[in-house]
Amino acid sequence: MSDMRRLMILFLLVGLAVVLSGCATLSVHSKVNKDGSVESYKLVINTSSFVYGLLAEGAKKEGYESLRESFLSEIPEEMRDKVSYDEVWSGDQVSIIIEARDYVPADDDKVKIRKENGFLIYEDLSFASENNQTSSNELGNALLSSFSLHYYLEMPGKIVESNANVVKDNKAEWHLTGASAFNTRIYAKSEVPGIPGFEAALAIVGLLAAGLLFGRVKG
């Protein structure tokens, strides 16, 4: 299992713990580079101080001083310089912010990026159940009814195909609630921008080559 996949599983476990403990909103902000690497993948969990207290209490029972320490202890050592953890408080509400930066998804990661026929294809299967069906369990649906997922994706080029709720230029948004948030495959297909100035450089090289060829013929 790749380090990034382990980290993604950890992200989801934290999010799931919050969901099962009470109402919550989960936001994902993902930004992709034109070479297919991920510039940043940020997870923001917004919940109440009560739910946070339950999670912190669970962490202390496991021998950790805080929820932060509990989370950071699970991150592979080679990934620690690429991952940050922050908490932002506002009255009775808290935002848990976890971000990974500058990594290339492995083949077994939930986040998959590939180049195909001149396009860049992005998929995130983190929120797609294996059978892709909404649970019929009444208790499960009740627990998830207060859950919201907001996913924001920024691709390096214009998005030409996606299952997002909103698409504008190189950005896409998904806004999901309840059990449907865990039955969704995040998908987008974008153009791959050229290297700035590359076309101009080719034109200059072409003109120089033509000039040399013309000079030789004339000579």
UniProtKB/Swiss-Prot annotation:
Localization terms from the record: Cell membrane
UniProt KW keywords: Cell membrane, Membrane, Transmembrane, Transmembrane helix
Top-level taxon: Archaea
Keyword Transcription regulation carried by entry: no
Pfam families in the record: PGF-CTERM (PF18204)
Keyword Disulfide bond among UniProt keywords: no
Entry's transmembrane regions: 8-28, 194-214
Membrane topology, record value: Multi-pass membrane protein
GO cellular component: a single term: plasma membrane
NCBIfam families: PGF_CTERM
Identification of the protein by name: Uncharacterized protein AF_1487
Organism: Archaeoglobus fulgidus (strain ATCC 49558 / DSM 4304 / JCM 9628 / NBRC 100126 / VC-16)
